[in-house]
Structure formats: C-alpha cells, structure tokens
Amino acid sequence: MMDQSIADAFPEVQVLEHEPLSKYTNTQTGGPADLLVFPESVTETKRLVLWAKETDTPLTIIGNASNLIVRDGGIRGLTLILTKMDDIQVNGNEVVAEAGAALIQTTEVAYQAGLTGLEFAAGIPGSIGGAVFMNAGAYDGEISEVVTSAEILTRDGEIKNLNNHELDFGYRHSSVQDYQDVVLSATFKLRSGDANKIRARMDELNRLRASKQPLEYPSCGSVFKRPTGYFTGKLIHEAGLQGFTVGGAQVSMKHAGFIINVGGATATDYMDVIHHVQATVLKQFGVTLETEVRIIGEEK
C-alpha cells in the first residue's frame, strides 16, 4: 500500500509504487523503486525534496539513467526521475536547458539556432542534469567548457545559482556530486557559427560513435574512468577480456570500454563483470580502474 503521507501531501501527483527501474535504465536492468515520481516543474521538485527531508525519507535523483547501474535490490524511499523537466530556451548566444532535457536534443536546438560549441555532445545519451553532475565529455570537449552556470536545489530545499567556478568541474566530477544537490537547469554560452559546419561536425561524430560503440545493444555507456597515462579500452583489450560474459552482461567485442546487455542481464551480472575486469587489469598491469558509471541501490 502506498505511503499515505505522500499520497496526502501530493494528491495531484502520480506516485508509482515498487516500480521496476529496469524500465528506465539504459542497461535495462535494476530493481524496484519503493516510490517513484516524475516531477514536472521546479516547484513540484522542491516540494518533493522538502517532503523527503521532513519525513526522513531517503531520496534519490535520477536523470536519463544512461550512465547508471541500479542494483537488483532497488532503491528505498523516494526516487525522482527528472525527464519531464525538459524545456530548452535560446536567448541570443545562450541556451538554457532544464535538467531533464536530453543532451542530444539540446545539441539539436543549438544547431537549429546556428550556435556552435556543443557539437562534441552530439550522440551523448544523457540528460542535462546528469551531464552537469558528472561533467560529461567526448571527443575533446567537456560540459565544463560551455556551461556558465547551473541552477541547483539543495537537499534543504534552497535554490542556488552556481557559476562555472563554483561548480568546481574536474574529470567526470562537479561540486554537485560532493553535496548531492539537484541540478534544475544549466545555461550554456555558445557562439554564432555556420549551420552547415555545425551539422557536418555533429554528423561526423555520430558516425564515429556508430562505428566504434556497440549502440545496437543496451549499455550504460563508458563504464570506467580513463586512468592517467592509459586508455581504458586498450587495457581491457590487452587483458583479453573482450567477450567476457556473466549471465547477460558482456564486455563488448566492438569497444572494450563498454559492457552490454546481450539478453536478460541483471545488475548483479554487470557488477560481476565490472569487478572481474577491475581485478584482471590490476593483476596484469597494476592499474586501478575506477568506475565512471554511477552505481546506486541495494543488493538483492
């Protein structure tokens, strides 16, 4: 039965109970969320965050669930998925996108406005919130290079506007991770450009992705961070791990840095593959592979 306090506090909000998160993650794995809500506005998100604090309910925030593994035991308390907060506005050379907006769609909006600077993100399957949270990047570009500010919501329900310096970006890191704040929106400072050149660069990067990455299978994208002085995929390839499989989770033959769902994988399968890859690379090369993918939830 639904937690009556959340039903009383939010009679107008659809609250899903014991909802399998495998329906929403890119890996198509993950256990249930006790309570799941898709907030549609900043106001609604703030009210839900404050409710969680006031009722001492564990709170988890999810974006597009593209670089995410949810363990098979699922997530206790309240989970918010922000994908319905997806407005994108263009103001001169600035693009302001809400946290749930897809990064791919944001790059398209920038292109249509004749703005250059976001081409590197073409094809990255995450949300704006997730991209800021982890300073997403590819092909020599990073979110930190184009974000001027982000509106965030603290776990105390306070809305702040953090500039680029305050976001303290690093390799796959931002201050949002340190304080577990909620990204509400981000502002990108771009430049006027030639629409044909912008489109050509986006198409080129999408072709590169398709040729190098196993896009035909469910996956969580790049699993490991790049260790200093090494290429992750090369290490995994040289360790002879491509094709290594546990259950339905497999180290991709196409790109060693990806773990794909070849059918019926569980999050436990994914974690077993990750741990085996880490142990093997450490033993063979003395290199520790840290996970880039966000791993949350409880063991089953």
From Swiss-Prot:
Active-site residues, as the UniProt record annotates them: R172, S222, E292
Record field: catalytic activity: UDP-N-acetyl-alpha-D-muramate + NADP(+) = UDP-N-acetyl-3-O-(1-carboxyvinyl)-alpha-D-glucosamine + NADPH + H(+)
InterPro entries: FAD-bd_PCMH, FAD-bd_PCMH-like_sf, FAD-bd_PCMH_sub1, FAD-bd_PCMH_sub2, MurB, MurB_C, MurB_C_sf, Oxid_FAD_bind_N
Cellular localisation: Cytoplasm
EC number of the protein: 1.3.1.98
CC per GO annotation: cytosol
Keyword Hydrolase set for record: no
Domain of life, per lineage: Bacteria
A biological-process GO annotation: regulation of cell shape
Recorded family membership: Belongs to the MurB family.
Stored NCBIfam families: murB, PRK13905.1
The name this protein goes by in its record: UDP-N-acetylenolpyruvoylglucosamine reductase
Organism: Pediococcus pentosaceus (strain ATCC 25745 / CCUG 21536 / LMG 10740 / 183-1w)
